[in-house]
């Protein structure tokens, strides 16, 4: 026959074209069967898969075909054209007969292979040498293509579809590749129950991301392998479908549907032996439905309803609502299994089950206290994710962090290395000098280098020894895991002799060695001389949480304890004259960091009342500075911007359908990004009353739902509200101690008139800031002058202010109504401006001291 592209499938024709190019490259005049056989093998496609099924080593077989080809006579140069040889012509005729025998429309790869197996020139000889007969080849072809017929020019895409587009979870469970599944018995039992139904035997697992939906299916695969399932599921295959691979590369209309049909056909023809698992099943809805093509879910519906296809789906609550509930016909074919977040004790059990896997992977030990801390701390502090996923991630990252420390050079050795490098450079420099001082220094350096060299070598030896011991421990754990897998496989195959030999011989020996190695390491860890740690502790977990969220949950070290105990004194140094306010704020922070504050409420919520300029906002800034080392580290909401009713949406985000829905709220977004913060609501009385309705949940439950439906956690925030309400009463009665109760009563009446009782009742404390006395203003002068001095230091100038000048500034800046702000203006006017003019006029140069004194009702600067 004269071959044309229309007679062949795409891959078969590509092989013939490749064979022609191979003949030209080999300088052969005729195109023969060995060229075609080698071209088929080099395709790395169906021919190789079929031959592998017969037990042939394809690489070795390809080498033998190449050797046969090299023995053919060749021309001196590549021919312009290649002629079809008699053997190949006959082989193509036989391939045509095979096509008709299979009832196919096109000559495919398998027809060519069968034709070449009957080739007297070389094919029969080469294949029989490899142990392949026509019958074994036919069996392999049937195994690969099943009972499908070739009706288009790309049939290879539909062969072994499940192997190409799926992953066998039962095979993975058999090989020990899946993590153990702890708990979830109720959900697995319900899934098995639904799968055992006659029709609509399709469970869909619905739950939040990270609660363990895929793990339930993996648990089912492990139960199938262990035979721990009812008769209806015994020896079944559980295959997970990769929707991405199914869609990828489907260029033409109908190609995706063809692939999916091939997968579904394989599943249905297996007579219930295959259970399909589609993770993220909502991707099936609308998949492939572009330009008039059919939606993938419509291909599934008839099979799902009749019970021909047993399918497990998994999706989140939101995706199920958005995609699957919109298609009631698809929804009714699936039975819902709701998967809730496990409790903290359940999560601890799950972590204990996974512990060994993570220890083997990272080569470190994980303390049980670290697992408990991971479950409890992640539950409390990581509120936007779900257990057990977030707890597992914490353990994983903590172990990875410790492993990185083990493999990196210890700090002690690194410091010595740097010191040696520094001294070597100094030695090199001094070697060129001839004076006695340099020579003396050189001798000292050489002595120091000798000492450091000894330290370096002993520490390096110790490091390598400790590292080797840890690596040995890790290798033993890996070996134990491998032997345990062999024991399980032997028990499944009823090879009890081998199982007993492994379990009571090899495994027992390995476990004894492991115990000895662990005891040795524990003895070394007991001393303070070790360079490496090899156990993940709860402190490691706390440090990782602090990195993730910015919330300081690590165990308090001595320096931080002292810092917290001194917090009140530090705040007093910056906020003058407001003892009650400073004490209340410091107490709240100390309660929180000691772990005694209510986990379901903010750390503290205060309403600061008082006249303007007495330190309400300054105290908030001082607190932010002490906690986060920056005045700007607080979230400041100016309530004067929320005077209209509609501005509530700016705080928590616009509702769906409104402009700015995607942007989120100013308050909620700030807290989501920085959960540990000081939040200042400045001038609250200026805001619209409806704004306070939003704050009720924040103050009481430490949470609020933003415009996008996300719950934002405020339990690690300090809420400070400032207001000028009642400031007139404070000014009138503050000076007289006897009138203090009357003043508080009048302020409370003013508060009740402005704010609702449910709002006031939720605040931890309402603190009245007194108006400032003249003595306190004198201390504020010292603070302000100190700040000016630090600014002058940048210009290499010093500032000396006499006591008389300080008293004079306090006198002219004293105004009970306006607090400390007039003082600030007085310092700017009387002190900063003259100094600035003197600098600009060139009267002050670097290194000078600015002397400030007072006389004749003004300051004198020299």
Swiss-Prot record:
Name a GO CC annotation attached to this entry.
cytoplasm
What SMART domains does UniProt report for this protein, alphabetically? Answer: AAA (SM00382), ClpB_D2-small (SM01086)
Region (NBD2) location: 560-771
Return the annotated region ranges for Repeat 2.
Answer: 84-147
Tell me, what is one Gene Ontology molecular-function annotation carried by this entry? Answer: ATP binding
Q: What is its main location?
A: cytoplasm
Keyword field contains Chaperone: yes
Q: Where in this chain does the entry annotate a coiled-coil region?
A: 392-526
Location comes to: Cytoplasm
**Secretion signal: which residues?**
none
Annotated region NBD1: where? 160-341
Q: Name one GO biological process term.
A: cellular response to heat
The annotated region (Linker) lies at 342-550
| Start and end residues of each stretch annotated as C-terminal | 772-862
Enumerate the residues binding ATP 2. Answer: 610-617
Query: Record's superkingdom?
Result: Bacteria
Q: Which residues form the Clp R domain?
A: 5-147
InterPro entries for this protein: AAA+_ATPase, ATPase_AAA_core, Chaperonin_ClpB, Clp_ATPase_C, Clp_N_dom_sf, Clp_R_dom, ClpA/B, ClpA/B_CS1
Annotated segments matching region Repeat 1 = 8-72
- Residues that bind ATP 1, according to the entry? 207-214
What's its job?
Part of a stress-induced multi-chaperone system, it is involved in the recovery of the cell from heat-induced damage, in cooperation with DnaK, DnaJ and GrpE. Acts before DnaK, in the processing of protein aggregates. Protein binding stimulates the ATPase activity; ATP hydrolysis unfolds the denatured protein aggregates, which probably helps expose new hydrophobic binding sites on the surface of ClpB-bound aggregates, contributing to the solubilization and refolding of denatured protein aggregates by DnaK.
The family note in this entry says: Belongs to the ClpA/ClpB family.
Q: Share the domain note from the entry.
A: The Clp repeat (R) domain probably functions as a substrate-discriminating domain, recruiting aggregated proteins to the ClpB hexamer and/or stabilizing bound proteins. The NBD2 domain is responsible for oligomerization, whereas the NBD1 domain stabilizes the hexamer probably in an ATP-dependent manner. The movement of the coiled-coil domain is essential for ClpB ability to rescue proteins from an aggregated state, probably by pulling apart large aggregated proteins, which are bound between the coiled-coils motifs of adjacent ClpB subunits in the functional hexamer.
Output this protein's name.
Chaperone protein ClpB 1
Question: Gene encoding this polypeptide?
Answer: clpB1
